[in-house]
Each structure stands twice: as structure tokens, then as C-alpha cells.
A protein has these predicted regions:
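Membrane-proximal interfacial segments on either side of biological membranes
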Residues: 1-287
């Protein structure tokens, strides 16, 4: 079978007829291109993926037709395998945080599992190695995406050990080849984003953020917890916890080195401050 210049090969397709329903089950193998990926996931990937890309896929499907031969129900499960998949990130600038970043993300020897059905449910799972540049050693990445009606969920687990991470605002730097891992859960519903969970950690440092809701301009409308325990570039152990409950914000810290923040503020002509990332919290702050 050929569809949109792509060949489909099937080992088995079976059908079952009764008075009201026609049930069709089967499998097929094919090559997936950019247009088909965009159609399946209802998203245009042309700015991120090469339009000449062809990926190997094997799928199982189930289709139910009513007596007028209109689709009543369907389910598609696909497994896509690849040796290398380059994602172009020309419009994303992470260089000031990830010094090795070269505006590309290359998946290595990975697998994508895709589930689509007629109940407005979509699930995508990616398990792969990755590199940010050609000199790096591939590290693990896992990505899960699900969509049920209008609600979307993203789950990311990534090993950042191969790359230098520089967070000047908090005077933190992680060198190349030093372990660091990121776990991230984000949900989106009706154009409202919520950071459910953020963990950036290794054996010496830990950053945790929970239940952050973003408004316009990605300013923070609400949050539950912002917590950090880390060694800064002065080898000083910082610990800080910011908790919000109802209209009360509690800030606790036994040790926190703000010398670099003061120095940067004195040098900078930018009059912005930390609280500008928040949007009208109207809270009482207890320190």
C-alpha cells in the first residue's frame, strides 16, 4: 500500500463483521517522514526536523466502523526506531546556561513509542541517548508526553553530566564530567502552564521546585515550594526554603551567601529585582 509517497507493508490484516460493527485489526511497517509525524501529532515540526528525514516504524491498529462504514473507534500503537535524530534549536538560546550548547539536540540510538486513539488521547514515550555537540559522550534521556482532551503533560528525565552548567544569578557552576540530573514534570491546560515538579541534583547539590503556576509573560502566579541546597563558586553551602500556603510565604535559611548578588547589583544598570518574576501574589512574607 502507498500513502503520501510512503510504502506500507503488512503481515496481517483481519476483519470481523456483525450486524452493527465492522472490526478491522492489523499491523504494518513503513518509513515515516516529517509530514506524517506532523499529521499524527497535530504539530508542525518543520522548524525542528529535517524535511528529508525517514524513520523506520512498525505499528498495530484497531478500527471499528459503524453500519454506514464511518469510523466509530480507532487505536494506533507505533514503535519508531532510529540511530540518529537531529533536532534544530536555532530559536532557543541556552548558551549562557549550557556553555557547550550549539543550538542542536541529537538523539542517538533511540526509540519512540506512540499511542493514538479516538478518545482524544495521545501518548508519546521517547527513550534514547543524546548529545548537544559532536564531541560529547552520549547520555541518557527519557521523555513522556500525554494529551487527554485539552490537557497536556510533559515528563523529562535527563543526564546533564557531560555538560557545563553555569547559573550566574545564584553563583552556581557545574563543571563538565561532573554528575548532574534533571527531572521535570510540566502540565498545560487552556494556555496555563504549571511546573508540577522540578529536581536538579547530584550528590552535593539539590534544587527543588513544586507546584508553580505561570501567568502571562511566564510570571509566577502561585507556587508551593522553592528549595535549594548547594555549594556555590565560593565553596559555601547555601540552603534556602521558600514555602507558600494560602496568602503566607515563609522564607527560611541557615546559610546563604549573597555576596555575588550584591556585587552584580552594584555593577548592573538593570533595576529589576527578584520579585519581578512573580505576578501579584499579594502575600505576607515571613522570614
Amino acid at each position: 500500500v502507498e500513502y503520501k509517497n510512503l510504502n506500507f507493508v503488512s503481515k496481517q490484516i483481519s476483519s470481523n463483521f456483525n450486524s452493527n460493527i465492522v472490526q478491522i485489526n492489523g499491523d504494518f511497517k513503513n518509513k515515516i517522514n516529517l509530514n506524517l509525524i506532523s499529521s499524527l501529532l497535530d504539530y508542525n515540526f518543520k522548524d525542528y526536523l529535517d524535511d528529508k528525514i525517514l524513520l523506520s516504524s512498525k505499528s498495530n491498529f484497531n478500527i471499528s466502523l459503524n453500519k454506514k462504514f464511518k469510523i466509530k473507534d480507532y487505536k494506533l500503537e507505533s514503535e519508531i526506531n532510529f540511530d540518529s535524530l537531529k533536532v534544530n534549536l536555532d530559536n532557543i538560546d541556552l548558551k549562557k546556561y549550557l556553555t557547550n550548547f550549539e543550538k542542536k539536540f541529537i538523539f542517538k540510538k533511540g526509540k519512540i513509542n506512540l499511542i493514538l486513539n479516538s478518545n482524544n488521547k495521545t501518548k508519546v514515550k521517547v527513550k534514547s541517548k543524546y548529545v548537544l555537540n559532536d564531541k560529547a559522550e552520549p547520555k541518557e534521556i527519557k521523555l513522556k508526553y500525554s494529551k487527554i482532551n485539552s490537557e497536556e503533560k510533559y515528563v523529562l528525565n535527563i543526564d546533564l553530566s557531560e555538560y557545563e552548567l553555569d547559573l550566574k544569578k545564584i553563583n552556581f557552576n557545574k563543571k563538565e564530567d561532573e554528575e548532574l540530573f534533571l527531572n521535570l514534570i510540566i502540565t498545560q491546560k487552556k494556555n496555563v502552564y504549571e511546573l508540577n515538579n522540578f529536581e536538579l541534583f547530584n550528590d552535593k547539590n539539590n534544587f527543588t521546585i513544586k507546584k508553580v503556576e505561570f501567568g502571562n509573560g511566564f510570571k509566577i502566579k502561585d507556587f508551593k515550594l522553592i528549595e535549594a541546597n548547594y555549594y556555590n563558586n565560593n565553596n559555601f553551602l547555601n540552603d534556602i526554603s521558600i514555602k507558600k500556603k494560602y496568602n503566607n510565604i515563609e522564607l527560611k535559611s541557615k546559610n546563604f551567601d549573597i555576596s555575588s548578588n550584591i556585587e552584580e547589583s552594584l555593577k548592573s544598570t538593570d533595576k529589576s529585582n527578584f520579585f519581578e518574576i512573580f505576578k501579584d501574589l499579594n502575600c505576607i512574607i515571613k522570614i
